[in-house]
Amino acid sequence: MRANSKAKPVSRAALAGEADPRLVALSVSIQDDGALYAEDIRGSQAHVSMLAAQGIVPKAAARRIVAALDQVRAEFAAGRIRFDPALEDVHTHVERRLGELVGKDAGYLHAGRSRNDQVALDERLFIVGACDRCDAALERLQRAFLGQARAHERTILPGYTHLQRAQPVSLAHHLLAYVEMFGRDRERFAEVRRRAAVSPLGSGALAGTTLPLDREAVAARLGLAGVTHNSLDAVSDRDSAAELLFACALAAVHLSRIGEELVLWTTKEFGFATLSDAFATGSSLMPQKKNPDVGELARGRAGRALGDLVALLAILKGLPLSYNRDLQEDKRPLLGGPEALVLTADAVAGAVGTATFHAERMEEALGSGEALATDAAEYLVERGVPFREAHEAVGKAAAFSAREGRPMARLTAAEWASFHRRFEKDVLRCFDARRSLKRRELPGAPGPRAVRAELRRWEKALGKARR
């Protein structure tokens, strides 16, 4: 594109002279919104086609504009468009290059449209696409977790509360917890997409236009569900952007949780898992190191995602109706957030899908019964003892076990009976982890049948998603 910094920007038609270079430097946004070129061109093609159908623009001119915009899109994609700060934003860059290709016909394009409703459409189109990309990445992540869960139905490990051993669960149940989280994330992205998929074009700067536009036709051409209903709101609404970044932030928080577990589980102290070499890094100094950078970066990226959300909300706070230039600053958090999530999700999917989980070490970590103390309390409850009384009795047994230096599973039947008269010899059966799991078959529980039911449910759900 031929740069022409002396040409007066279209927004200065009523102003004398040129803008001060300091204002130009502050105002330029092409370095950020240039990433929206595909959405901007797509919206322009739908808009000019509608203008022609409504008799506002000659059909031949509209056809030339649509064809030329295809060329502009290709030039952007190939990196052949040189950004000119004097042209400020992506809209002006597209229109200027269009003018070089079709001459005065380019002047038809902006009829009935403002950059205010134009950029609102660009962002909505971006959000719809971003939701689809995030959903696809999260589905890939779910499949990675589901594959490992299916392979580890019989692997038992301690479940943790407060990072202290609590009760036994299967590794499949543990991994399915993340499948659930990512399922909720996908639902959120679907909701964001649904609300974003309406067209603001026709809202103009803030009060529509006197031209007989067909707003619904533009929405239909773009594959959107309908149109916005208030022009003031439409040009200043960034709710969908905020919702998208919230969905990204919460998904990133979920990724940070598995990231933390990958870091912990791959330590010698835990020894629950080993990352494949393809998803580990070394040290520039210590040749023996195998570092879980993928988990650490997942934790770190969550901080960035939270920052993007807070940055956008701070920009929106206190803005009067309708459009304000503050909204130019929404591009950096909006455009970077979804792509960072996709990148992180794919890396974590690869790390989890290729990791080795050490079943023997996990089962060793259950210890000799402490994680099954609740089963002993419920043993009494099944015999008519109030739970608080049962809880106190087992607590005394746990304290005695610690003082004696003997695991609870090694206490004698007589010792158990000393803590409560309803304890009998068969209380020792409570300290069999596999038996314990088999007795936990409520829906959503870690029992083998319950876990298999959840595996089948998710396999069916993801199978439908693939089709």
From Swiss-Prot:
Pfam families: ASL_C2, Lyase_1. It catalyses: 2-(N(omega)-L-arginino)succinate = fumarate + L-arginine. It is found in: Cytoplasm. GO terms for cellular component: cytosol. Its EC number is 4.3.2.1. Keywords: Amino-acid biosynthesis, Arginine biosynthesis, Cytoplasm, Lyase. GO terms for biological process: arginine biosynthetic process via ornithine; L-arginine biosynthetic process. GO terms for molecular function: argininosuccinate lyase activity. Signal peptide: none annotated. InterPro entries: Arg_succ_lyase_C (IPR029419), Argininosuccinate_lyase (IPR009049), Fumarase/histidase_N (IPR024083), Fumarate_lyase_CS (IPR020557), Fumarate_lyase_fam (IPR000362), Fumarate_lyase_N (IPR022761), L-Aspartase-like (IPR008948). It comes from the Bacteria. Gene3D superfamilies: Fumarase/aspartase (C-terminal domain), Fumarase/aspartase (Central domain), Fumarase/aspartase (N-terminal domain). It is an enzyme of class 4 (lyase). Pathway: Amino-acid biosynthesis; L-arginine biosynthesis; L-arginine from L-ornithine and carbamoyl phosphate: step 3/3. Belongs to the lyase 1 family. Argininosuccinate lyase subfamily. This is Argininosuccinate lyase. It comes from Anaeromyxobacter dehalogenans (strain 2CP-C).
